[in-house]
């Protein structure tokens, strides 16, 4: 008689193997499903956001350093307080629209700390100039409104560094390599579209220009032409009323405005824009001739705003040229004793800017309720040209 165990075991063994294999497969599949995959690395923020964040961090660092210098008596607080106010307004302007978006490390550095390494007055001036140069450089690449904000921030920091060096008696920072002369190279050109019914002529436009160049860019170029034409007219009207010590610089500035007007007209032509006719005259502000110096400064500040508009809507060589022209206009405004504001080229309503976190009650924290405008002298001593005697 056959043993039943010997007959059934061989048949059960494959079945057991199948059960074990199926169980292992289920366990493995559940394990892969429960173990989350690695999250992809976050995408790098766009250049404009990185440039804005860097500008904010440096403004806060400089602000903290200025407060430290003033608190330790290493420099005259009366000289440093306007700079701290300037940096405070700039930092508030650089904050992202989203509340609390400033980097935590940057905001933490805004408060002077006993553990922070001391900085000398000369080092502070050099750091301010370095930050201004970096902002101007980034403005040539950043997008639209951020570019305008960076250009104005950098221009104001460079001006403040120069004036602060004079006030503190420390070496003046070396001028940035970027200037009107080095930034005004011509754009690569392509033929402009010919008017309907006419053969295509030799006129040229920048690559991406002509019909492809945004209308707001051509409009901003036309506005720059108008601003320069008005500046030329203003200088011609003011020259006979200026003191001899002011007439020399005014003549140089007049020549520069004529060059800028011609350059703006050429860029507008290359952009296939409609030429701006030369006006026979302009209506000057009441009292312009009675106080020609300060009113020339206001004209320069207005020109800076026109170039700020162009910075926001242009690219490439036009952008670089506009950034440089904005800097120069702000500098000339200061030469005439007019403060172009904390962000030249951009009208700021400081009351609408977000407050810096943790700034309540801090000296220099909130800044003035309104930004120093083109017609005011708030801020560092301008060290302008000699005053003009009252016109008879």
Enumerate the predicted regions with their spans:
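All-alpha RGS (Regulator of G-protein Signaling) helical domain and cognate RGS-like helical scaffolds
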Residues: 2-392
């Amino acid at each position: 008689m056959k043993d039943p165990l010997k007959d059934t075991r061989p048949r059960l063994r494959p079945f057991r193997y199948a059960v074990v294999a199926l169980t292992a497969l289920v366990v493995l599949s559940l394990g892969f499903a429960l173990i989350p995959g690695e999250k992809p690395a976050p995408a790098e923020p766009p250049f404009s956001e990185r440039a804005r964040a860097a500008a904010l961090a440096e403004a806060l660092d400089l602000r903290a350093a200025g407060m430290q210098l003033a608190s330790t008596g290493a420099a005259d607080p009366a000289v440093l307080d306007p700079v701290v106010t300037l940096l405070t307004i700039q930092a508030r302007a650089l904050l992202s629209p989203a509340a609390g978006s400033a980097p935590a490390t940057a905001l933490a550095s805004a408060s002077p700390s006993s553990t922070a390494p001391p900085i000398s007055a000369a080092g502070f001036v050099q750091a301010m100039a370095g930050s201004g140069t970096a902002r101007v450089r980034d403005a040539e690449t950043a997008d639209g409104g951020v570019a305008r904000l960076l250009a104005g921030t950098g221009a104001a920091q460079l001006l403040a560094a120069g004036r602060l060096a004079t006030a503190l008696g420390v070496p003046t920072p070396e001028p940035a390599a970027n200037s009107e002369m080095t930034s005004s190279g011509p754009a690569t050109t392509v033929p402009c579209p010919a008017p309907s019914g006419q053969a295509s002529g030799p006129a040229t436009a920048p690559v991406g220009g002509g019909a492809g160049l945004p209308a707001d860019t051509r409009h901003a170029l036309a506005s720059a032409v108008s601003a320069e034409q008005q500046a030329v007219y203003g200088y011609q009207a003011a020259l006979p009323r200026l003191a001899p010590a002011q007439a020399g610089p005014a003549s140089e500035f007049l020549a520069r405005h004529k060059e800028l007007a011609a350059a703006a007209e050429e860029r507008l032509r290359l952009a296939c824009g409609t030429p701006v006719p030369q006006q026979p005259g302009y209506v000057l502000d009441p009292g312009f001739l009675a106080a020609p110096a300060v009113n020339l400064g206001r004209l320069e500040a207005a020109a800076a705003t026109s170039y700020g508009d162009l910075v926001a809507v242009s690219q490439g060589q036009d952008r670089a040229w506009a950034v440089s022209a904005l800097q120069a206009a702000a500098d000339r405004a200061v030469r005439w004793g007019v403060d172009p504001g904390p962000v030249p080229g951009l009208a700021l309503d400081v009351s609408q800017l977000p407050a810096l976190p943790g700034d309540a009650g801090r000296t220099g924290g909130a800044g003035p309720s309104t930004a120093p405008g083109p017609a005011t002298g708030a801020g560092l001593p301008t060290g302008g040209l000699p005053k003009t005697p009252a016109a008879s």
